């Protein structure tokens, strides 16, 4: 980790370049503090408190730093005991740390849509998932986001694993909403997003297909979507 930080901090800009530090977390699963709440004991797993220290150091050296989360943030480590509170630990932490994007993961849907919407309603950044739709046919969350670093425009496209349907529909956790196929939505989003200098996929998906289902892994998805070649 120290070598990675040193690498980031020692890079230098010149008149033809701009150094942008993109920092991302994923699968935090309720470990905001280095504490296992189910066992009520300290854990070496780490947590967002440790991440926060690294982020602060990098931001001090490079103001062109962006922090995002790629999904599975709110579930785990006994965080379900806070579901009916006015304030949920995850949103309090990510607001404090200055996360600009929260991508939805499959576990964000474990508690149902009403709970999820209530939790992210207190988030100050951009909640994203390009393949989540309401019954009226409109996207429930942002599918893409553009961040400006001076004259440079960085685009972010968001997708979640379509396996959410298999995990959550039978439980009734998607009531009133639909999760669509990632390949179809990626084609749409590539058409919709304005021209940018760089395009980054924020996908809560593995590299390879899940259960041998096509386009549930990023490698298969990008190979099959022709516009992704651009």
Question: Where on the chain are the PLM-derived regions?
Answer:
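Acidic, metal/ion-coordinating pockets
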Residues: 1-230
